Amino acid sequence: MSRSKKKGPYVHPKLLKKIKEMNEKGEKKPIKTWSRASMVVPEMIGHTIAVYNGMKHIPVYITENMIGHRLGEFSPTRRFGGHADKKSKKGQVK
């Protein structure tokens, strides 16, 4: 079930405060955040947000196409180790 339209999008208050301060000053330095559930809002366009994936912060440059998505969608948490190698069958005669 999606979030109620009446409530509006969720953005961590401290993250939104940092974005607004940087917009007023005109700065564009990366912002570290652990809030993967925060939604991308138009105020974030042009900023780089370092989203934590459980191991390190992944820098994500925010563009217009990302509006309405969550920050966690752009920072994968799982690493693909590859498929298992085929092992030769023992005792098989060719």
Swiss-Prot record:
GO MF assignments: rRNA binding; structural constituent of ribosome
GO cellular component terms, A-Z: cytoplasm; small ribosomal subunit
Region Disordered, annotated ranges: 73-94
One BP term from GO: translation
Keywords: Ribonucleoprotein, Ribosomal protein, RNA-binding, rRNA-binding
Pfam short name (any one): Ribosomal_S19
Superkingdom classification of source: Bacteria
Leader peptide range in chain numbering: none
The name this protein goes by in its record: Small ribosomal subunit protein uS19
HAMAP family: Ribosomal_uS19 (MF_00531)
Family: Belongs to the universal ribosomal protein uS19 family.
UniProt xrefs under Gene3D superfamilies: 30s Ribosomal Protein S19, Chain A
Organism encoding this protein: Kosmotoga olearia (strain ATCC BAA-1733 / DSM 21960 / TBF 19.5.1)
Main function: Protein S19 forms a complex with S13 that binds strongly to the 16S ribosomal RNA.
Cited InterPro entries: Ribosomal_uS19 (IPR002222), Ribosomal_uS19_bac-type (IPR005732), Ribosomal_uS19_CS (IPR020934), Ribosomal_uS19_SF (IPR023575)
